C-alpha cells in the first residue's frame, strides 16, 4: 500500500512581487514532492498566497488600487513564476477564495463553540511590520520594526490551555518535528509560559480580512 505524503510551502504574502527566496523555498518543496512520487508514494503539494492583512491593504493603497485588484495581480505573478520554473504543485490556494474562507469560518465556529475563544482588552507593543503584538523582550531584540503601543479589544485563542498537550505530543511522537535540533528548539520554547493568541483585528483599524463568523465588527 502506498504511503501518503503532504507538503506545503508557506502561503506567501502578496504585499510585494515574488523574489528569489520564494523561488528557493518552492523549488525545495517541489523536489521533495517529485521524489515522493518517484518512489511510489501518493504526494500532494500545496502552495499559495496570503492575501489579507495590514501590509497588503497598505501596499494596495500605495499603488492606488483596491486590495482585491492588488491581490489578483500579485497572485498571477506567483502562478506565472511557478509555471516558468516548472513547479509541479497540485493546488494553489488564495486566502480570498470562498473555499478558503468557508473552511476558516467553520473552524472558528468549532473552536468558539468549544469555549476556546474569548474577548479581552489588551494593551501592549504592536509590530506593524509583523502584524502582531510582541513582548518587551522581542521589542529589545532589534528584529522588529514600526513598533507602537496599542490598546484595543480583540479575540484570543486559549493556546495556553494546550501547552502540556503539545509538549506530551511532541515527546511521544519523535518524528513529529524534524530535525532533532528543531524539535529541541520548540520544546525549549514551550518550557516558557505560552501566551494566548490574538486572532482578530477590529474593522475600525483593518477591514481587509476574513470576517469573524460570530462578530461582524472584527476580521
Predicted features and spans:
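Structured secondary-structure scaffolds
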Residues: 2-47, 99-103, 142, 147-219
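Short cysteine-rich clusters marking metal-coordination/redox-active sites
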Residues: 127-129, 139-144
Amino acid at each position: 500500500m502506498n504511503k501518503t505524503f503532504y507538503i506545503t510551502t508557506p502561503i506567501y504574502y502578496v504585499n510585494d512581487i515574488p523574489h528569489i527566496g520564494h523561488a528557493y523555498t518552492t523549488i525545495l518543496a517541489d523536489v521533495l514532492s517529485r521524489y515522493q512520487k518517484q518512489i511510489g508514494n501518493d504526494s500532494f503539494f500545496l502552495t499559495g498566497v496570503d492575501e489579507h492583512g495590514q501590509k497588503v491593504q497598505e501596499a494596495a493603497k500605495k499603488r492606488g488600487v483596491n486590495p482585491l485588484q492588488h491581490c489578483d495581480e500579485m497572485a498571477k505573478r506567483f502562478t506565472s513564476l511557478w509555471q516558468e520554473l516548472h513547479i509541479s504543485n497540485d493546488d494553489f490556494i488564495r486566502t480570498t477564495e470562498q473555499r478558503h474562507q468557508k473552511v476558516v469560518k467553520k473552524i472558528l465556529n468549532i473552536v468558539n463553540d468549544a469555549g476556546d475563544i474569548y474577548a479581552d482588552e489588551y494593551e501592549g507593543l504592536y509590530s506593524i511590520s509583523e502584524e502582531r503584538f510582541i513582548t518587551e523582550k522581542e521589542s529589545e531584540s532589534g528584529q522588529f520594526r514600526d513598533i507602537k503601543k496599542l490598546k484595543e479589544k480583540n479575540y484570543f485563542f486559549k493556546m495556553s490551555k494546550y501547552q502540556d498537550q503539545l509538549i506530551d505530543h511532541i515527546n511521544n511522537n519523535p518524528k513529529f518535528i524534524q530535525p532533532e535540533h528543531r524539535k529541541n528548539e520548540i520544546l525549549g520554547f514551550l518550557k516558557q509560559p505560552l501566551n494566548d493568541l490574538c486572532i482578530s483585528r477590529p474593522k475600525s483599524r483593518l477591514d481587509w480580512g476574513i470576517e469573524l463568523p460570530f462578530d461582524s465588527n472584527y476580521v
